[in-house]
């Protein structure tokens, strides 16, 4: 039952969050002078790249002075930072590992009112990032955090972090299918391929493939198959 599964996951997140705070594992982004864009991202304002844009646009102040130079270092222990006139408040870094069930969407805003992955965790004042996405009908591990720096390092293609997917396909997958995936399949945005693919398990009427991707596009695996 979807609702029972969601309730259990939410209870687990609450317990994990409480334990994390008791053990002192959740830390503030301040630990001496850091680059301004890194501080903003770590505080959950936006991704690192979006924070750089905010700085260049003159929307960030340090000690009541507008800062537009990227790489400027600040220390939240001794300096005040404002974004669009709103003071930046140090917040604990929070991490949730979620086993996303089917029927849940990873988008943070859903006009259709469907269950979102953000609904599975306790209410947090900090803005949470979904590191990677799975479509509504897929299930698997998703990381939610307000650590913008970590989110960027895990999700941005230039860091080369591979994501592993187990995909069940109808029938038996032969070597030709695996080779086609390795060489790349032409999609609307161009030719895309996998980092690695292998047959994990074979059933009478279906096959489980293990597929590794370095960069995930919208419903990429479904469209490739």
PLM feature segments, named:
Residues 19-225:
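Basic, flexible Lys/Arg- and Gly-enriched helix-loop patches that mediate nucleic-acid binding at interfaces
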Residues 1-16:
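Single conserved hydrophobic/aromatic residue that forms the stacking wall/gate
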């Amino acid at each position: 039952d979807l609702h029972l599964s969601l309730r259990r996951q939410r209870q687990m997140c609450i317990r994990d969050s409480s334990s994390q705070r008791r053990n002192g594992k959740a830390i503030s982004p301040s630990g001496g002078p850091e680059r301004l864009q890194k501080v903003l991202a770590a505080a959950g304002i936006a991704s690192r790249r979006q924070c750089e844009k905010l700085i260049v646009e003159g929307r960030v102040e340090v000690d009541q002075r507008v800062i537009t130079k990227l790489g400027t270092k600040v220390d939240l222990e001794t300096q005040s930072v404002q974004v669009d006139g709103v003071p930046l408040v140090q917040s604990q870094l929070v991490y949730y590992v979620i086993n996303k069930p089917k029927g849940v969407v990873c988008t943070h805003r859903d006009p259709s009112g469907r269950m979102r992955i953000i609904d599975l965790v306790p209410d947090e004042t900090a803005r949470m990032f979904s590191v990677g996405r799975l479509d509504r009908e897929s299930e698997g591990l998703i990381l939610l955090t307000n650590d913008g720096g970590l989110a960027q390092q895990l999700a941005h293609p230039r860091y080369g972090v591979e994501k592993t997917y187990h995909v069940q396909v109808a029938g038996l997958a032969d070597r030709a299918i695996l080779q086609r995936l390795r060489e790349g399949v032409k999609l609307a945005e161009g030719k895309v391929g996998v980092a690695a693919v292998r047959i994990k398990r074979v059933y009478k009427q279906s096959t489980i493939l293990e597929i590794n991707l370095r960069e995930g596009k919208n419903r990429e695996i479904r469209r490739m198959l």
